[in-house]
Amino acid sequence: MVVVTLLGCGNASVNEGSQNPVRESEIIDFVFEDISVSVGTTVVWTNMDNKAHTTTSGVPPDVSGVWDSPFLKQSQTFSYRFTEVGEFEYWCRVHPFMTATVKVEN
């Protein structure tokens, strides 16, 4: 499931106690964070920068096809639900030096 919204959010947080756990992550100062979540968690990225970014699975310049957000303007969000165990590298198509990993465990 992929959802793009125009809502802002606060600091990064985890709500894994519910049936639909959510992990929030802010894109700020041209930096992505490494993220660890459980299977079934939805990660919600919020762009806090005044420049557009994407969150795109893969390693620059290759898109792996797992997820690829549209260009996110300031305060826009992108969500992706992780349904499989693994390590998923991701990057920004606008700024390929921005890279990080989502680690998904049982």
What do the predicted segments below correspond to?
Residues 1-8:
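Sec-dependent bacterial lipoprotein signal peptides
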